[in-house]
């Protein structure tokens, strides 16, 4: 069967992939620079073809709780927003993490803090990887650096979310969301039937069929001893995720004396910066974390054994650099370069930062 290749925006790829990967429901609210997700879904009308429901909620708060409710019934449910909207969703996300309910959240980041700007940013790294709500919890975080990965990561996010009964986030940004590239769309995957949901998700609140105890979805537990055990179980789950689900990519690292560590659109910019640097005789390669949680700590620690220094490039004031420094543990210099206010760094600026900070 011939592959279907189309030209589209990253946001549009999210919408097409959601329909094709068996998503049962999308609940969202428009906000720049991710509005094309819900706009595309409205145009495609998947409720008439696959049965996928698309709801424009009254707010981001309502959106995440609709996801919580649908996912609590074992359905593949998702939402998308941009930075201020995802900030509003944090209460619902921590509820889902505490109740061990899977769901997918897409964050097409823009500049902040506060209302900030509609221009691109990577300023939500800490919020995504540390858990922006209350309590000790983690969200699985995937960081696409192309429109193709925007499409591919929707199904991957659902697979990981249901495998570990945990919210999963696709942490994109305004560059990837708005840029247009060729995409190979994934094949259609049928939505699960109600019987399949009952069989595959015994934890889900699907009513009370015969020979089954009732299921209550909640993050609340008033007995400290039981709550401690639930928290310890969560931490054990996060350890398993860290052990089994790390994903990363390396480019031109074989002969590299220096490394750039970057994710998302910053990694795309760094690819060009590496070309420029190598033309000037600087041997540098790229290490791109694809999962931000679980973070490739061990792999970066190994990387540090063979490099003279690392430059972390991110479109923020310096967030992922903290995790890189923890991984390197002082073995080699680790510096950071970024732009703020919605300004995207030029490749030449990255090369100059490499020279200024590590040479």
Task: Give a label for each model feature.
Residues 9-13, 235-258, 271, 275:
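Glycine-/acidic-rich phosphate or pyrophosphate-binding loops and their flanking alpha/beta elements
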Residues 36-130, 140-162:
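Thiamine diphosphate
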Residues 139-195, 349-359:
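Structural signature of the thiamine diphosphate
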Residues 6-43:
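N-terminal glycine-rich anion-binding loops that anchor highly charged ligand groups
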Residues 314-359:
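Peripheral docking tails and interdomain loops at the edges
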Residues 165-250:
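Conformationally flexible catalytic loops at phosphate/diphosphate-handling active centers
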Residues 270-303:
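Generic long, charged, amphipathic alpha-helical segments
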């Amino acid at each position: 069967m011939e592959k279907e290749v189309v030209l589209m925006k990253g946001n549009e790829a999210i919408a097409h992939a959601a329909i094709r990967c068996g998503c049962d429901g999308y609940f969202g609210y428009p906000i720049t620079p991710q509005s094309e997700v819900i706009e595309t879904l409205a145009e495609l009308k998947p409720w008439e073809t696959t049965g996928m429901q698309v709801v424009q909620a009254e707010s981001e708060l309502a959106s995440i709780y609709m996801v919580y409710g649908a996912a609590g019934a074992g359905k593949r449910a998702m939402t998308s927003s941009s930075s201020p909207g995802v900030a509003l969703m944090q209460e619902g996300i921590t509820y889902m993490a505490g109740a061990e309910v899977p769901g997918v959240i897409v964050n097409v980041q823009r500049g902040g803090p506060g209302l900030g700007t509609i221009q691109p940013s990577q300023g939500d790294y800490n919020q995504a990887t540390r858990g922006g709500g209350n309590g000790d919890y983690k969200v699985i975080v995937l960081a696409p650096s192309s429109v193709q990965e925007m499409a591919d990561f929707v199904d991957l996010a659902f697979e990981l979310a249901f495998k570990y009964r945990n919210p999963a986030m696709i942490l994109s940004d305004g560059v990837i969301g708005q840029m247009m590239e060729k995409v190979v769309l994934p094949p259609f995957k049928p939505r699960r039937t109600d019987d399949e949901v009952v069989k595959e998700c015994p934890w889900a609140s699907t009513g009370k069929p015969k020979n089954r105890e009732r299921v209550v979805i909640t993050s609340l537990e008033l007995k400290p001893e039981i709550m401690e055990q639930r928290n310890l179980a969560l931490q054990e789950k996060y350890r398993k995720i860290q052990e089994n689900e790390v994903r990363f990519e390396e480019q031109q690292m074989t002969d590299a004396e220096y490394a750039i560590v970057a994710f998302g659109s910053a990694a795309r910019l760094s690819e060009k910066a590496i070309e420029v640097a190598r033309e000037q005789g600087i041997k540098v390669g790229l290490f791109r974390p694809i999962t931000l949680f679980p973070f490739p700590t061990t792999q970066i620690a190994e990387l540090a054994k063979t490099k003279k220094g690392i430059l972390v490039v991110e479109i923020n004031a310096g967030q992922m650099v903290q995790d890189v420094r923890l991984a390197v543990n002082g073995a080699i210099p680790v510096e950071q370069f970024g732009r703020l206010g919605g300004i995207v760094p030029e490749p030449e600026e990255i090369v100059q930062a490499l020279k200024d900070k590590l040479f």
